[in-house]
Swiss-Prot record:
UniProt binding sites for GTP: 11, 69, 138, 142-144, 204, 226
Lineage, uppermost ranks: Eukaryota, Viridiplantae, Streptophyta, Embryophyta, Tracheophyta
Name of this protein: Tubulin beta chain
Binding site residues for Mg(2+): 69
GO CC aspect terms: cytoplasm; microtubule
Gene name as annotated: TUBB
């Protein structure tokens, strides 16, 4: 019941996705052969949200992996959990998109998209009552942004009434890996505004800052960054997978967070984040979690919520705690920081409580906020876009793939 189909595309998406499955397998007690080796029946009760039970009691993730070059997927396959995925669900091309949105969306990606859709259809037919799709991708490259948005729009056509949730890694302001990021990101955002229901906005720079300042890691790797992302991804869906006092699902989330259909870009945060050395000095209490969760340093994208106002927010707590205390803390936050909330939506914080905490923690919380300050991200990308587009720099790479200048 209520299955979620996970799709990962491009190098970034596949690396985040691989990490995410490590976390989910750990939570449900599934080892790297797909066999269950956990210790509580709660782990199995709703395991079918993310897993399909195959013959011989193996659990197979409902995941579709796609890329336009085989490299990253080979490393996923040879990674710790590479053997649990269904081999037919690896769909890859040979040519690569070369950081070019047009290649991913129009030429190379369009050739591969039908085989991806076949796999998606197969997985969807295996579901009892499909709730929606979650897509991991980045917006700076070619495959994740171009082919990712193409896939999202195709799925939208075929399953118009299912939720579409994306975890999108935006180009960061200071750290840039490609010159044409602003083009790719702008073209993608245009698609996401139309075709996605909920976008969790992530950003490498903000994640680096969290690793650096909060977790006190001297040299954070992409693995550490992806671990943060996967903690959040797991938190968003914990209510579907474990019993709780106040449940939420993707649709409830959307209904409570989106005041106007185009404003569906959210900032996410996760608590408790503590460096390995200072863990034993912190008390895990609801007020403590709440405080860290609303902290601007805790946001996983480079926009400062203090520069805007929250339209709505959602807090998901995990672990054994009193719902009364959660409600008190939420009211408390809204009263103390009332200037940061819009006054035309009263009680705009939704909270939910799930009884089972993540592995290794007593309690944890995930934060999702719909804040007006997210415009900083869009403004930054669009300024970089305008600067290049004014000179028509790099455009020939896109027009050469059959795009028209008017599309920009």
């Amino acid at each position: 019941m209520r299955e979620i189909l996970h799709i990962q595309g491009g190098q970034c998406g596949n690396q985040i996705g691989a990490k995410f499955w490590e976390v989910i397998c750990d939570e449900h007690g599934i080892d790297h052969t797909g066999k269950y080796s956990g210790d509580s029946e709660l782990q199995l009760e709703r395991i079918n949200v993310y897993y399909n039970e195959a013959s011989g009691g193996r659990y197979v993730p409902r995941a579709v992996l796609m890329d336009l070059e085989p490299g990253t997927m080979d490393s996923v396959r040879s990674g710790p959990y590479g053997q649990i995925f269904r081999p037919d669900n690896f769909v890859f091309g040979q040519s690569g998109a070369g950081n070019n949105w047009a290649k991913g969306h129009y030429t190379e990606g369009a050739e591969l998209i039908d085989s991806v859709l076949d796999v998606v259809r197969k997985e969807a037919e295996n579901c009892d009552c499909l709730q929606g799709f979650q897509v991991c991708h980045s917006l700076g490259g070619g495959t994740g942004s171009g082919m990712g948005t193409l896939l999202i729009s195709k799925i939208r056509e075929e399953y118009p009434d299912r939720m579409m949730l994306t975890f999108s890694v935006f180009p960061s302001p200071k750290v840039s890996d490609t010159v044409v990021e602003p083009y790719n990101a702008t073209l993608s955002v245009h698609q996401l505004v139309e075709n996605a229901d909920e976008c969790m906005v992530l950003d490498n720079e903000a994640l680096y800052d969290i690793c650096f300042r909060t977790l006190k890691l001297a040299t954070p790797t992409f693995g550490d960054l992806n671990h943060l992302i996967s903690a959040t991804m797991s938190g968003v869906t914990c209510c579907l997978r474990f019993p709780g006092q106040l449940n939420s699902d993707l649709r409830k989330l959307a209904v409570n967070l989106i005041p106007f259909p185009r404003l569906h870009f959210f900032m996410v945060g996760f608590a408790p984040l503590t460096s390995r050395g200072s863990q034993q000095y912190r008390a895990l209490t609801v007020p403590e979690l709440t405080q860290q969760m609303w902290d601007a340093k805790n946001m996983m994208c480079a926009a400062d919520p203090r520069h805007g106002r929250y339209l709505t927010a959602s807090a998901m707590f995990r672990g054994k705690m009193s719902t009364k205390e959660v409600d008190e803390q939420m009211i408390n936050v809204q009263n103390k920081n009332s200037s940061y909330f819009v006054e035309w939506i009263p009680n705009n914080v939704k909270s939910s409580v799930c009884d089972i905490p993540p592995k290794g923690l007593k309690m944890a919380s995930t934060f999702i906020g719909n804040s007006t300050s997210i415009q900083e991200m869009f403004r930054r990308v669009s300024e970089q876009f305008t600067a290049m587009f004014r000179r028509k720099a790099f455009l020939h790479w896109y027009t050469g793939e059959g795009m028209d200048e008017m599309e920009f």
